[in-house]
C-alpha cells in the first residue's frame, strides 16, 4: 500500500508519503531452495528515503525490506516527510540571491505481524537538513547534516546503530567552462567502525571533461584510506568514465538501486548511453 500527499504554495513545499510492503519479493529459487540472493531477484523496490550522493551519508544505505522467509521477516511499514522552503531574494535570510532549505524525516519498521499495519522493530531512521546558498555568481555552497539510525540485523534483533554526518559541498566557477567542486565530510559514531572522514576534489572542463580525486579514511577504527581517482568524458548522449582506487566491502548505491560489492583495489570502466 502507498499513500502520498503534497502541498506547494508561496515558496513552501511539503511532501508526505507512507508505504507498507508485505511479501513483495519475487525471485527464482536458487538450487531448488528459497535462499535469498540478489543474483536471482526478479524485482527491485527502491527505498523511500533520501537518496544521498555523498560518500559518508551512503556508508550504510537503507534497502527496502520486501519479505524474507529465511529470517521470518514479512516486510516493512513506514514513510517520509519532505519540507522545502525558498527564501526570496531581498529577504532577511534570502539576501541578494535567495536561500534554499530542505528537511527530511524518514523511518521504517518491520511488520509486527503478517496481515497487519502494526510496526515492529526499527529498521531505519534518518533526520536531515540541507541548506543551499548562492553567495556570488561564481560561488555556491551546500551544507548538510544527517542523523541516521539503522538496524544492522535487518530487523532480526532490536539493536540499532546511530551516526551523525556533516557535509560541506563548495562549488566555484572560474569561467563558464572551468569550475571546481570540493566536498568535506565527517561521520561521528560510537559504534561499528567509529569515526570516518572524507574529501573529494572535482575539476570540470565544460561541456565534456571532468577529473576527480577522493579519499575516505576510517580514522576511528581500521585507519585505512579508501582512495579513488578518475576521469570522465561526455559527448551527446554518451558518457565514458575511467577510475582507479580502493573500494570497501558493502552496498554500492546509485539512483536508489543498491548492490553488494566485495572489497577490492583496481580500475573501473563505465560507459553510459541513452537512445
Please give the residue ranges for each predicted region.
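Exposed, low-structure sequence patches enriched in small/polar residues
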Residues: 1-275
Amino acid at each position: 500500500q502507498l499513500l502520498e500527499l503534497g502541498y506547494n504554495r508561496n515558496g513552501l513545499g511539503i511532501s508526505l508519503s507512507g508505504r507498507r510492503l508485505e511479501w513483495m519479493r519475487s525471485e527464482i529459487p536458487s538450487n531448488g531452495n528459497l535462499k535469498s540472493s540478489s543474483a536471482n531477484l526478479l524485482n527491485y523496490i527502491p527505498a523511500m528515503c533520501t537518496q544521498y550522493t555523498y560518500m559518508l551519508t551512503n556508508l550504510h544505505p537503507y534497502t527496502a525490506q520486501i519479505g524474507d522467509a529465511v529470517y521470518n521477516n514479512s516486510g516493512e511499514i513506514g514513510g517520509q516527510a519532505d519540507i522545502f522552503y525558498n527564501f526570496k531574494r531581498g529577504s532577511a535570510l534570502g539576501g541578494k540571491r535567495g536561500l534554499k532549505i530542505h528537511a527530511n524525516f524518514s523511518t521504517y519498521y518491520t511488520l509486527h505481524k503478517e496481515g497487519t499495519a502494526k510496526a515492529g522493530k526499527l529498521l531505519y531512521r534518518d533526520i536531515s537538513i540541507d541548506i543551499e546558498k548562492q553567495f556570488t555568481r561564481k560561488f555556491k555552497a551546500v551544507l548538510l547534516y544527517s542523523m541516521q539510525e539503522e538496524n544492522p540485523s535487518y530487523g532480526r534483533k532490536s539493536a540499532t546503530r546511530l551516526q551523525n554526518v556533516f557535509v560541506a559541498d563548495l562549488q566555484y566557477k572560474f569561467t563558464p567552462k572551468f569550475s571546481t567542486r570540493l566536498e568535506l565530510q565527517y561521520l561521528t559514531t560510537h559504534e561499528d567502525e567509529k569515526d570516518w572522514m572524507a574529501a573529494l576534489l572535482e575539476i570540470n572542463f565544460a561541456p565534456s571533461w571532468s577529473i576527480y580525486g577522493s579519499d575516505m579514511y576510517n580514522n576511528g577504527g581500521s585507519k585505512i584510506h579508501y582512495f579513488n581517482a578518475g576521469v570522465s568524458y561526455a559527448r551527446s548522449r554518451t558518457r565514458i568514465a575511467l577510475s582507479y582506487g580502493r573500494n570497501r566491502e558493502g552496498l554500492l548505491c546509485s539512483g536508489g538501486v543498491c548492490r553488494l560489492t566485495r572489497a577490492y583495489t583496481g580500475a573501473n570502466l563505465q560507459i553510459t548511453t541513452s537512445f
